[in-house]
Amino acid sequence: MRVVLITLFLFIGAAVAEDAGIDAITPEEGKANNIIEAYESPRFQKFVTHCSSHVTQTCSGNDPLNNQEASRMNSPFGLSFCLFDSMEKCLADHKASLKDPQDNNNLASMSSLPGSIQNQPLLIETVKFRTVLKTCSHVSAQYCFTNPNVATSALADCLMPSLNQCVYPGSILLPWPPPPPPPPPPPPPPPPPLI
């Protein structure tokens, strides 16, 4: 049911953007044209960065208060849903808004989608952010999830930087995707023969 609702909101957002004549803007295009998307706002980024640690702890199975989430980690698909749902819940808990606090328009949390005509720009930004977050949840889950028996500590260490780097590709904190691990050191030379 949740997937159907999210899909419906995405189609509505796309239709609203098409009617308004607004094209999708990639983060690189936005920076080149001085257009700042809602999900690139420093205030909002602070919440995403803060929530990433909670989300990765929950979805990697390390959260003792949420043992039911550990069972969802059996596939990249389940892990991506866990990442998206946990991030959305954390942002809503922190009342993170999608608009700049300097803006006089109504502010909305992640969990509420405005319905009136005056709030169409906020609806468009909400749909854009949810799309980015959904895509990044899927990409991070695919990248970090190697097999059902992956160590939870390694999973948490991979999820947080990959999720942050995907949502904010302009902030080059870590290379995306992370480079492969360095090769193991060569074995020590054999001891000299005894004469």
Swiss-Prot record:
Pfam families registered for this protein in UniProt: Nodulin (PF02451)
Phosphoprotein recorded as keyword: no
Any single Gene Ontology cellular-component annotation: peribacteroid fluid
Keyword annotations from UniProtKB, A to Z: Membrane, Nodulation, Signal
Subcellular location(s) per record: Symbiosome, Peribacteroid membrane; Symbiosome, Peribacteroid space
GO biological process annotation, one example: nodulation
Extent of the signal sequence: 1-17
Main location: membrane
Family: Belongs to the nodulin 20 family.
Protein name, UniProt field: Nodulin-20a
Organism field: Glycine max
Taxonomic placement: Eukaryota, Viridiplantae, Streptophyta, Embryophyta, Tracheophyta
